[in-house]
């Protein structure tokens, strides 16, 4: 049996842009994607700390060092620039893998610059 487990998150990031006319997804600074081990086009959950909205989408790469967290498409109705969010990724793991899994937690400052990486 496989279990769906939390494996990584970018914690308390700040939304920098919301583009209603974009096709969809969330644009994330590539440095943050790398730190969290989230791939381009990977499914992510976004939990809005500011207003409580939650959604599923997929990750796109933004310029390195830009701090961009861009909410695209219809999701821009639910999240606005300045909102604080958690971006989380999950994966399927065997029982053995799940028991030793150490999720990555990427902490950022108010400008979405990497502060530290710590296990969950």
Curated annotation (Swiss-Prot):
Entry keywords, A to Z: Autocatalytic cleavage, Cytoplasm, Decarboxylase, Lyase, Pantothenate biosynthesis, Pyruvate, Schiff base, Zymogen
SUPFAM superfamilies: ADC-like (SSF50692)
Reaction(s) catalysed (UniProt annotation): L-aspartate + H(+) = beta-alanine + CO2
Subcellular localization(s) per the UniProt record: Cytoplasm
Gene Ontology molecular function, alphabetical: aspartate 1-decarboxylase activity
Chief place of localization: cytoplasm
Matches recorded under Gene3D superfamilies: 2.40.40.20
EC number of the protein: 4.1.1.11
Pathway(s): Cofactor biosynthesis; (R)-pantothenate biosynthesis; beta-alanine from L-aspartate: step 1/1
Assembly behavior: Heterooctamer of four alpha and four beta subunits.
Official protein name in the record: Aspartate 1-decarboxylase
Protein's gene: panD
